[in-house]
């Protein structure tokens, strides 16, 4: 009876449903008429929804569908374009278009679906899909209008339509039917010019025997349930047997009438049927279901527990069955012939079991049969059955996957001999034993796919929420890459202090990580008792294919599966809790790693290897993570929401520059810049070079103690020494070190892990490797070290050495990375020798430390070495006479020898080195007729090797000498680049005793010298960089005995200004007994301007150096000079700013704007700007900028580039000159005109300067990089800051580099420069620098300057004639003009009014190329009595000395280019002359050479000023008349600078800049022009 009732109910249900199907087969026929439309209720397409219909047409254009938001931004439009369907849509005014590939105007029926998923919209035509994605600010679409098919009403206002022109689009012509919003049918609101059409796919009546036709997925389908027939067309008689129609009726297979027993699962919902009250025991059973999904892995159904269970799942797109009857699991995999089952199409699964035989079939075609183990035939189930996901899929017995299912399941039925469970129907009707967890939707909805993401760069990453796992958990994902290394996943817990056996604290954390290293996948786990590292792959997994990783943990144990290969693991210790905190990082780590504790065992993290490749289907504890959405929300840089592998090799286009090696990565090229001297993505940026002289070093101090088990180290070096420390890691607490040094011309790698301190049992001491030969050849060599645990590999150029460390201890501890000198010596028994040479491109675990230190990107860098490829002269010593010598301890060179030294001399002969020994053994090095001789005797008789230099070496230039002897008794002598080699047979050992004599012998020893030794006198000259077989002696302090005149440093024989006397455009100032160099405007210091000035590095966070003048000593200036050296990569920032007292508003600012340097200043009127427009300066190279101002006139010059000039315009001076010509006799016009010109009423004074701000932090325009040698109007502010001047405050990220450089004083010869103090200057100019390590001088800053005078507390603008009481802080009554710090000062009478002070110096006019015009008559005040005249270099004065002008300023054409060591236009200086172009106030249209600086004192009263004006003008005229009358015909009565003799014709050298006066006219030497060309000085 129950069967009958059930049948009646079924019949009624089907009948009512098929009644609605008749309506669905009625379509809409559109005729293509104007103003035709069919209007449906609004479709909610805001976030997620599907729309579908079927259509047929033979036209190529027409509007199919349209909706919008009422004329604002959003719309969706479907139309036909050239016979294909076009989808246009817009969200938040961002628009895109999708065009189908398939032609549809073929008069055939086509199925169309539009799928909305937030910013993504898909278009599917007959199963072929495309999608478009928008970068909109909001992830939803606003929909206001109803939905229109076939066209739109013409009566709608165009302004109410979002898409312009939609009303003008042609209407659709054809048939449409079966319009659905998801699975529901929308209500038709109205139509116009549209007919109902009964045709359609079912119009041909394909069903026989009364079967009812309906559409299923766009195809006609027959319902035969009421006919008694079966088959596709209801043509098969059911009574003929239990065929397919019988199965369809009894099992409700694919009937549309039973589609309501469908459920959608999104990963967290699941169904559970309770079997605990009625356990099932059966010998045979059957499971049937259908599924539809995009997902590759996921649980479909599970029943049973322990050893009795059935598990059905998707595994990598195939159907997996695992069944266990208690005797062992039977596993079966069914895979399709083409593609995968996760194609979002319906697939039918049937599992049958009869005793031990198990059969599984998919879609009735693909079938697999097998047998369970042993004789167990009963399946017992007394637990719950799960449909779809489960609460913990990873913990289910036999589950091959840990993912929950995402997709649709329908008609899930379990039956055996006794029971039939229609699980889908039971869930839908809410049966008591069927529990529903989550929001299960009982219809099939579109489930968003878990799109893959692509990490395009190693720096890319995304962060995931905290993983709440304690005792158990699971993670699964797929990855795909071609790169061998990368951190895939890391999460860790709170730091904990743990103590080892020696009570050494060590910060440890619980952590969980997955990494790809050398192509293999590793799982790392630490639960508090030590780290385990599990290798999960047998072959490399970086072949570009997808790999599925499934990790399941239960307490301490678990498994990791890669594809189908399982690897079990067990954590250390007893803890079963994994205590995690904070985010989980996927693909890499953030740049700011504050708070991150990186496990030592996680090598990819320590080596900075980020993952580059694709990841998809991330499930944590069975629940999916939409990582594409997370990446979008985090705006993750370098993460792309797609995954496709480029077919073309990236290196085929040869993207790497400078001979770098190109490697193909994942959709990218990788340029290996090692050994090129460059860095960057394509190795396009030149790496910084550090020069070391044996006393210099760079030390990187780690922000915290580092522990590593893997290191990548690479760098380039160049040296002439055979010994010296290159790079080493050092620890403050242990003897741990990884050290690379030169040892006998080879690179020695020593790794020492301090096993004793941590009480480990198996350590044999340091591991040592050697590679390379004769590397002290002054050529670049590349070193690379790779350590992975116990494995070591050292590569020097092409020489490779490998080794394996003995012992279990592999952890390296270090606090510092040191180069040049090892400063951390507490645990070092033998300190390595210091390095002399050059180092470049030091990379340690992915960080380029030299450039990071130079650019200020790290704050923990001690820098004593010097930037740039420099000629290194270390520790020079001068032997002033041939009788001078010293002795050192015996030379130790028994089995082998490496000697190196540098010398410079003008003598052709002399002893350099001598050491005698046992028997006849000796060694001697001497200079004979200008050539080096190496003489020795090892016991077989004396031998001599003579250098083969191209010319004699006594040319007063530095030369390098290398002498070596190896174990094979091969001797070589290398002088500069010339090498002579000789093999000596016989004795191989050199047994020396007694003292080693340097530069000479005691007087009585010359008569007893061995044969072949030619010298009978000592060496006169300079020795430097002496290396005695790895020992660097201090020739003076280490000497056992000294005789004669021996001084530290190297003084040359020249005492007059030469073209190479001053480097870097310094000005040579000739004195009677020598010369000095004015380095003010060079940014350098030292006696020869070749030592760097005080240098500060400003970091990323910004810094400020603020100098404040004392309140009673604030200067006001008419002219200013500013110079500074810098290197930076920022596009915008303020370098220096000088401000006047509050309320005045005067300022001067040097800044970088859009990468270009410029100056803006205001002296009381408007802002005046001058800028270098030609070339950006933020290229990371070292530049020197010079700025001069005289009134409103200004010049700006960068390096030796053309000078930029600014001259104001106006008519004031023209009017004044016209007045002069009318009122004053003609012959006095010119001097008075010049005087009036200077006193123009334009504002020219920079008033009451109060402070100098360096770094830009106070203005919010931060400067990052280095500043060096800042000079402003006599103040060397950076030197003052380094000496802790009380008027200077330093804030922020500002770091002094090296030590305070000394300031040159007045010397009478070219004396030894002070020690090479550290700076940060990038230059390609090779400059000789002589240095010492002792007797460092401190800089002395003079408070006076050439153009400053205190205005005390009197703050007034330039032209305000307001009484102001001057400060009494200065007692001098004369104007003091300092030519250079420590130099002479010229004094002139004090002028009480600023407007009546005559021009101190008038300069000739010049063009924009700074050439000189005919000179003008020069006016100056009388100099003080007793002032010594200063003559041009090389010029002798045979006449009586007359008072000379205070200062004469001439412009200096730039002499250096960055890529040249030659002068462009060497000039000879006049005594005390400046070399920097300055600016003079001048009349409009006439450009003049910049003049001298002026200092203004303000008058005490207006009355005094007026009286002074009258008196001074009368006095000047009288003096002028008297002078011209008295000296008119007397040549001998005045001194004229004879400039025709000032030129020194020496060729330009590499380290000097001199200044030469131009003649006013080529005819000035003629006698008849003599009187006209005189310069008169009063």
UniProtKB/Swiss-Prot annotation:
Record SMART domains: 4.1m, EGF, LamG
Residues covered by the EGF-like domain: 198-235, 647-684, 1053-1090
Entry's family note: Belongs to the neurexin family.
Region (Disordered): 1328-1352, 1546-1578
A cellular component annotation (GO) from this entry: presynaptic membrane
Record's protein name: Neurexin-3
Transmembrane segments: 1504-1524
């Amino acid at each position: 009876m129950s069967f009958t009732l059930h049948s009646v109910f079924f019949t009624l249900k089907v009948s009512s449903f098929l009644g609605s199907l008749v309506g669905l087969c009625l379509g809409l026929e559109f005729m293509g008429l104007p103003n035709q439309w069919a209007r449906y209720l609004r479709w909610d397409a805001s976030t997620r929804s599907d729309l579908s219909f079927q259509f047929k047409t033979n036209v190529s254009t027409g509007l199919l569908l349209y909706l919008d938001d009422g004329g604002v931004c959003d719309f969706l439009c479907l139309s036909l374009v050239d016979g294909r369907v076009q989808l246009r849509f817009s969200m938040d005014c961002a628009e895109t278009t999708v065009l189908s590939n398939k032609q549809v105007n073929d008069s055939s029926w086509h199925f169309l679906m539009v799928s909305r998923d937030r910013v993504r919209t898909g278009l599917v035509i007959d199963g072929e899909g495309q999608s478009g994605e928008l970068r909109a600010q909001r992830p939803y679409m606003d929909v206001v209008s109803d939905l229109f098919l076939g066209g739109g009403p013409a009566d709608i206002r165009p302004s109410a339509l979002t898409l312009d022109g939609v009303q003008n689009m042609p209407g659709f012509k054809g048939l449409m039917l079966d319009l659905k919003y998801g699975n529901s049918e929308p209500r038709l609101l109205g139509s116009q010019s549209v007919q109902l059409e009964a045709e359609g796919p079912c119009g041909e009546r394909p069903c026989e025997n009364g079967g009812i036709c309906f559409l299923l997925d766009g195809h006609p389908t027959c319902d035969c349930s009421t006919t008694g027939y079966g088959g596709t067309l209801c043509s098969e008689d059911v009574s003929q047997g239990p065929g397919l129609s019988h199965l369809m009726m009894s099992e409700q297979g694919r009937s549309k009438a039973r589609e309501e027993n469908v459920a959608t699962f999104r990963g967290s919902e699941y169904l559970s049927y309770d079997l605990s009250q009625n356990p099932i025991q059966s010998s045979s059973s059957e499971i049937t279901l259908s599924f539809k999904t995009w997902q590759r892995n996921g649980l479909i159904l599970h029943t049973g527990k322990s050893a009795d269970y059935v598990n059905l799942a998707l595994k990598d797109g195939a159907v997996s069955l695992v069944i266990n009857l208690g005797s062992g699991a039977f596993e079966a995999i069914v895979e399709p012939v083409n593609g995968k089952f996760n194609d979002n199409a319906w697939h039918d699964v049937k599992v049958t079991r009869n005793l031990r035989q198990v059969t599984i079939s998919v879609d009735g075609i693909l079938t697999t049969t097998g047998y369970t183990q042993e004789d167990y035939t009963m399946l017992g189930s007394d637990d719950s059955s799960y449909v779809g996901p489960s609460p913990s899929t990873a913990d289910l017995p036999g589950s091959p996957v840990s993912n929950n299912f995402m997709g649709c399941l329908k008609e899930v039925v379990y039956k055996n001999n006794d029971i039939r469970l229609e699980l889908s129907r039971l869930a839908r009707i809410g049966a008591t034993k069927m529990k529903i967890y989550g929001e299960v939707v009982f219809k099939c909805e579109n489930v968003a796919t878990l799109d893959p993401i692509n990490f395009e760069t190693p720096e890319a990453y995304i962060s995931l929420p905290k993983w709440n796992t304690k005792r158990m958990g699971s993670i699964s994902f797929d990855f795909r890459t071609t790169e061998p290394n990368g951190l895939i996943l890391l999460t860790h817990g709170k730091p904990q202090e743990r103590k080892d056996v020696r009570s050494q604290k060590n910060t440890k954390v619980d952590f969980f990580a997955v990494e790809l290293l050398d192509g293999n996948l590793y799982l790392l786990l630490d639960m508090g008792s030590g780290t385990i590292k599990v290798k999960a792959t047998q072959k490399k997994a970086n072949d570009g294919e997808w790999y599925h990783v499934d990790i399941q943990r239960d307490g301490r144990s678990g498994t990791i599966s890669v594809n189908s290969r399982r690897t079990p693991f067990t954590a250390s210790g007893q803890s079963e809790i994994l205590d995690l905190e904070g985010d989980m990082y996927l693909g890499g780590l953030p740049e700011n790693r504050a708070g991150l504790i990186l496990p030592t065992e996680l090598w990819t993290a320590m080596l900075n290897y980020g993952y580059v490749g694709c990841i998809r289907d991330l499930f944590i504890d069975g629940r999916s993570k939409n990582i594409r959405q997370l990446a979008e929300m985090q705006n993750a840089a370098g993460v792309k929401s797609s995954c496709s592998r480029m077919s073309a090799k990236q290196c085929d286009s040869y993207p790497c520059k400078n001979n770098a090696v190109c490697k193909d990565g994942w959709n990218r090229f990788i340029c290996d810049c090692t050994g090129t001297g460059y860095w960057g993505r394509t190795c396009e940026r030149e790496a910084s070079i550090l020069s070391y002289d044996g006393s210099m070093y760079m030390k990187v101090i780690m922000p915290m103690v580092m522990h590593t088990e893997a290191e990548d180290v690479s760098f380039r070096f160049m040296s002439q020494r055979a010994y010296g420390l290159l790079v080493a890691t050092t620890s403050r607490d242990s003897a741990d070190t990884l050290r690379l040094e030169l040892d006998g011309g080879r690179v020695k790698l020593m790794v020492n892990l301090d096993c004793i301190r941590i009480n480990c049992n198996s350590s044999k001491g340091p591991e040592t490797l050697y590679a390379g030969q004769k590397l002290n050849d002054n050529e670049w060599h590349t070193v690379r070290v790779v350590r992975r645990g116990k494995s070591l590999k050292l590569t020097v150029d092409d020489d490779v050495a490998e080794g394996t460390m003995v012992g279990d201890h592999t952890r390296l501890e270090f606090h510092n990375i040191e180069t040049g000198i090892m400063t951390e010596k507490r645990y070092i028994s033998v300190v390595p020798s210091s390095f002399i040479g050059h180092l470049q491109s030091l990379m340690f675990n992915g960080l380029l430390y030299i450039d990071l230190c130079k650019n200020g990107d790290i704050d923990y860098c001690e820098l004593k070495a010097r930037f740039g490829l420099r000629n290194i002269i270390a520790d020079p010593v001068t032997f002033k006479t041939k009788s001078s010598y010293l002795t050192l301890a015996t030379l130790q060179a028994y089995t082998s020898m490496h000697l190196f030294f540098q010398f410079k001399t003008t003598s052709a002969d002399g002893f350099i080195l001598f050491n005698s020994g046992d028997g006849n053994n000796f060694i001697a090095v001497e200079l004979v007729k200008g050539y080096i001789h190496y003489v020795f005797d090892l016991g077989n008789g004396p031998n001599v090797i003579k250098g083969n230099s191209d010319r004699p070496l006594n040319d007063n230039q530095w030369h390098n000498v290398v002498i070596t002897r190896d174990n094979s008794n091969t001797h070589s002598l290398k002088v500069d680049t010339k090498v002579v080699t000789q093999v000596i047979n016989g004795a191989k050992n050199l047994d020396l005793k007694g003292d080693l004599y340097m530069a000479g012998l005691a007087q009585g020893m010359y008569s007893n010298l061995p044969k072949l030794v030619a010298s009978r006198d000592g060496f006169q000259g300079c020795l430097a960089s002496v290396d005695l077989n790895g020992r660097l002696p201090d020739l003076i302090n280490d000497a056992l005995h000294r005789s004669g005149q021996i001084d530290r440093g190297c003084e040359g024989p020249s005492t007059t200004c030469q073209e190479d006397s001053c480097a870097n455009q310094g000005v040579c100032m000739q004195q009677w007994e020598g010369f000095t160099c004015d380095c003010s405007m060079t940014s350098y210091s030292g006696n020869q301007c070749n030592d760097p000035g005080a240098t500060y590095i400003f970091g990323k966070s910004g810094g400020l150096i603020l100098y404040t003048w004392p309140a009673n000593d604030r200067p006001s200036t008419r002219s200013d000079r500013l110079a500074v050296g810098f290197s930076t990569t920022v596009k915008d920032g303020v370098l220096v700013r000088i401000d006047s007292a509050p309320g005045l508003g005067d300022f001067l600012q040097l800044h970088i704007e859009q990468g270009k340097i410029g100056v803006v200043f205001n002296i009381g009127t408007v802002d005046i700007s001058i800028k270098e427009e030609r070339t950006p300066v933020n290229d990371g190279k070292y530049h020197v900028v010079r700025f001069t101002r005289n009134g409103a006139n200004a010049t700006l010059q960068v390096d030796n580039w053309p000078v930029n000039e600014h001259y104001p315009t106006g008519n004031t001076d023209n009017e004044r000159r016209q007045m002069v010509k009318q009122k004053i006799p003609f012959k006095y016009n010119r001097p008075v005109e010049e005087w009036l010109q200077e006193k123009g009423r334009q504002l020219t004074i920079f008033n009451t300067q109060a402070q100098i701000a360096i770094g830009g932090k106070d203005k919010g325009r931060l400067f990052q990089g280095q500043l060096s040698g800042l000079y402003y109007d006599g103040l060397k502010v950076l030197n003052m800051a380094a000496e802790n001047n009380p008027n200077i405050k330093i804030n922020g990220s500002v770091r002094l580099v090296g030590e305070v450089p000394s300031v040159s004083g007045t010397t009478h010869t070219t004396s030894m420069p002070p020690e090479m103090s550290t700076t940060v200057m990038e230059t390609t100019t090779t400059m000789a620098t002589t240095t010492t390590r002792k007797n460092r001088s401190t800089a002395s800053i003079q408070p006076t300057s050439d153009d400053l005078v205190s205005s005390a507390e009197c703050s007034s603008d330039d032209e305000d004639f307001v009484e102001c009481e001057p400060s009494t802080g200065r007692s001098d009554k004369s104007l003091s003009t300092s030519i250079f710090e420590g130099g002479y000062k010229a004094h002139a009478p004090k002028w009480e009014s600023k407007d009546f002070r005559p021009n101190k110096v008038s300069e000739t006019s010049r063009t924009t190329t700074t050439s000189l015009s005919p000179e003008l008559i020069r006016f100056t005040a009388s100099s003080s009595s007793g002032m010594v005249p200063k003559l041009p270099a090389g010029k002798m004065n045979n006449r009586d000395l007359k008072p000379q002008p205070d200062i004469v300023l001439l412009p200096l054409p730039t002499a250096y280019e960055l890529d040249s060591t030659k002068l462009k236009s060497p000039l000879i200086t006049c005594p005390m002359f400046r070399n920097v172009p300055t600016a003079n106030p001048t009349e409009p249209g006439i450009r003049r050479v910049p003049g001298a600086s002026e200092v203004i004192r303000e008058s005490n009263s207006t009355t005094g000023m007026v009286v002074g004006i009258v008196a001074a003008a009368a006095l000047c005229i009288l003096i002028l008349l008297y002078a011209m009358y008295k000296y008119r015909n007397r040549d001998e009565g005045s001194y004229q600078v004879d400039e025709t003799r000032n030129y020194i014709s020496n060729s330009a050298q590499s380290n000097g800049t001199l200044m030469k006066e131009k003649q006013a006219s080529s005819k000035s030497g003629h006698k008849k022009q003599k009187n006209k060309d005189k310069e008169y000085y009063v």
